Amino acid sequence: MLAHKASHEGVLVAEVIKGHNRVYDAKTVPAVVFTDPEIASAGMMESECRAKGFNDLLISKFPFAANGRAVSMQETEGFVKMIADKKTHILLGVHIVGPEASNLISEAALAIEMGARLEDVALTIHPHPTLGETMMEAAEATLGHAIHIIQKPLTNGKSAHL
């Protein structure tokens, strides 16, 4: 399930042997489980964030049930969970359970690799209606201004849909 990781590491080793200066950051390697629904993850889990000293976190889940494309596909089970540093809004982890999670996680891996902030993801226009919109909506929810779900107010950095 991590053939993509092994392939990337092989290329990296070959480039280092050739004398190229390369950097490898394992935190951005996406993990995917091809179940129904699919499960995908990139970056850190909440417990890992806290273990690394990120104690003030913004965390939210956006349900696929609130996404038009998921509804039209009758694939509404699951969510996109985002974890970010409360002070900087830098995205630390994304965890997806739901339709096409294996494809959606790539945007999260790129955002984490780039050091993107929640605002970067939230302000990126996503085509409508697509499952990809769940990434934008999850970022908006994590910032506390989702428009397609009713949110409880942010408490202790956590937000949840009602």
Task: Give names to the regions the model predicted.
Residues M1-T28, H89, T130:
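Rossmann-like dinucleotide/flavin-binding elements
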Residues K18-N21, A31-M45, R50-L162:
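Flexible, glycine-rich terminal cap/loop adjacent to redox cofactors
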